[in-house]
Amino acid sequence: MNNDLTADSIIEMISSSKKKTPVIAYVKGHLSDIDMSGVQFFGTDNFGIIFADYEDLRQFLEKNGNKIHDVHIEAKARNSALPMADITKFNARVEPGAVIRDLVKIGDGAVIMMGAIINVGAVIGEKTMIDMNAVIGGRAIIGRNCHIGAGAVIAGVIEPPSATPVVIEDNVMVGANAVVLEGVKVGKGSVVAAGAVVVSDVDPYTVVAGIPAKFIKKVDEKTIEKTKIIEILRQRDH
């Protein structure tokens, strides 16, 4: 899977988009006589739920305040430039609490765990697991059959803009709380130890550790056994 978005194109989308403040409002009152055009309403004559942008809701409430007895408003974002992804389009396992922006690609059989954050333009390969609270920055490219450990950070390249995204090739294991900095390429089959800070490219089938990350050894049979991907965790019912 390739990343077709440049930093400049994402910056242009963010700067030119209409900023939105999506809200949910729970309303009580004499609702049967109210014109609901401009908002999305679900309910009865005296109680309902409204989905709208905050400015549209504000105008709606001002216009119909004499018919509404009570209202509770919950805002999902404020002046948001890009929407969240429609996760139903992914043939992957996405756990509750994962935060995935629009314009993200996620391959078949991938696993996105609770609290993981995937920013705009990122690419996640088939059967790759993004573990709890990991952060995948804008335009980062993660290959197939990888494991990005809990709390790890794969740097984004939107601000400051960079032409070269982070690339994690296939079958890479990134340990918990490791950090891979902007523009770095981690070669196929490599292992990045927990807590490492990777500031330069990593050769394929290499183990690196430390701050900054340095060569420890080539991947051997013992390393492969300790870092193997568990296929059953990537299975889906359909």
Curated annotation (Swiss-Prot):
Pfam families: DapH_N, Hexapep, Hexapep_2. One of its GO terms (biological process) is lysine biosynthetic process via diaminopimelate. Pathway: Amino-acid biosynthesis; L-lysine biosynthesis via DAP pathway; LL-2,6-diaminopimelate from (S)-tetrahydrodipicolinate (acetylase route): step 1/3. It comes from the Bacteria. It catalyses: (S)-2,3,4,5-tetrahydrodipicolinate + acetyl-CoA + H2O = L-2-acetamido-6-oxoheptanedioate + CoA. InterPro entries: DapH, DapH_N, Hexapep, Hexapep_transf_CS, Trans_hexapeptide_repeat, Trimer_LpxA-like_sf. Its EC number is 2.3.1.89. GO terms for molecular function: tetrahydrodipicolinate N-acetyltransferase activity. Keywords: Acyltransferase, Amino-acid biosynthesis, Diaminopimelate biosynthesis, Lysine biosynthesis, Repeat, Transferase. HAMAP family: DapH. Belongs to the transferase hexapeptide repeat family. DapH subfamily. Catalyzes the transfer of an acetyl group from acetyl-CoA to tetrahydrodipicolinate. This is 2,3,4,5-tetrahydropyridine-2,6-dicarboxylate N-acetyltransferase. It comes from Pseudothermotoga lettingae (strain ATCC BAA-301 / DSM 14385 / NBRC 107922 / TMO) (Thermotoga lettingae). The gene is dapH.
